Amino acid sequence: MSNETFLIPIRQNNDLSDIALNELRMDLDEHALHQRYYTDIAYLAGNSRKYSLNSVQTVASPLIGKKILFLGSSVTFGFGALGESFVDYLWKRDGVAAIKDAENGTTLVDEDTYKPNDSYVARFREELTESQPDVFVLQLSTNDANQNKKLGKITNQNFDTKTITGALEYMISTAQARWKCPILIYTNPYFANPLC
């Protein structure tokens, strides 16, 4: 089934926003087998129409107009929520000028997962020239642990971006020096894995 045909009933049944539809379209262009996964999760209670981004109202918020860069993988993308993540809710509800740089399955470490330059480090380097955020939000990826990436060691310089620690050190120190903005880091751990 074509991606466009596949998306018609999901959009209608789940009242998907245009943002989510575009996110899913781009993901399916790269990962056609995700159709099966999206079919399964479309019927989960948290993906019902009542939680659609279309039903969210904007409120007066101190975040209105704040440019926030979100760098991450599936959680930031909204993979389990049909492309509507917390980033989209902050945009709609609080008026955040969100930059959502998220690709499913990617890692912090500077190694290509699915295509060239899809790691957090590679995408971060692109954002350095394109963005000047008020806040930088970084998702700690569980994909690094799941793919047995090296943890690495804490250093003061010469960060080894082929390790989890080095990639984090590089992005944090570079963002602090370049953007001089608050940096928020979050994760969603798998409790059976000590790295997550």
Regions found by a protein language model. Give the residues of each.
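N-terminal secretory targeting modules
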Residues: M1-L71, V75-L82, K92-R93, T129-D134, ...
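Sequence-level detector for tyrosine residue identity
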Residues: Y37-Y38, Y43, Y51, Y89, ...
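Conserved SGNH/GDSL esterase-like catalytic core that processes O-acyl groups on lipids
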Residues: K67-L69, V75-N158, K162, P194
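Sec-exported extracytoplasmic/periplasmic mature domains
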Residues: G95, S141, S173-K180
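Generic structural signal for well-ordered alpha-helices
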Residues: F124, L168-I172
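Substrate-gating cap/lid alpha-helix
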Residues: C181-C196
